[in-house]
Structures are given as C-alpha cells and as structure tokens.
C-alpha cells in the first residue's frame, strides 16, 4: 500500500509515495548506512559548513517549506514560517 500525505483541512492528497519492496527498502537502508560512514569521518569544520548551507537554503525557501508544513499539518502559515526560520537559525548556529 502506498503512503499518502493528506491535508487535514480538506482531506486532499498532497503527495503519494509508492510502496517499496523489501529489496528496495534494504537498498535504501544500505545507502543511508554508507552515507553515515562517510559523514562520521567528515571533519567537524566541514560538517559545519554543510549544515550552515542547509540553513541558508531553508531560509531562502522559507515560504515554500512553510506552505508544505501548512498543507501537510494544517499549521497556520505564519506559525509555519516562524518554525522554518527558527529551524534555519538552529542549522546556522
């Protein structure tokens, strides 16, 4: 069965994610584990640059992320914007 993200306000499907086979899921888990092995060996100074960049991208796209949070969780748009900005600040720290 596919997974659906549903807007709690109007019941409309925001996005449908296809069901994965056991093999597909195992492959994704293996990829994540391999990425972690690389990440944990990355110096903190380089990780900080990467995470800060994620914060910059989040800040640059705050309205896009806020809209998505509103659609998926029924949050008020201004509340969602505030949460996105707060999260971006944490990443920048």
Model-derived regions: residue spans:
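N-terminal Rossmann-like NAD(P)+-binding subdomain of aldehyde/semialdehyde dehydrogenases
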Residues: 1-93
């Amino acid at each position: 069965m596919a997974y659906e993200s549903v807007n709690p306000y109007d019941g409309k499907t925001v996005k449908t994610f296809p069901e994965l086979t056991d093999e597909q899921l195992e492959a994704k888990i293996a990829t994540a584990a391999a990425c972690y092995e690389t990440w944990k060996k990355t110096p903190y100074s380089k990780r900080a640059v990467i995470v800060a960049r994620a914060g910059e991208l989040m800040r640059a796209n705050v309205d896009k992320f806020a809209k998505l949070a509103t659609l998926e969780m029924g949050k008020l748009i201004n509340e969602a914007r505030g949460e996105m900005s707060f999260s971006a600040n944490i990443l920048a720290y």
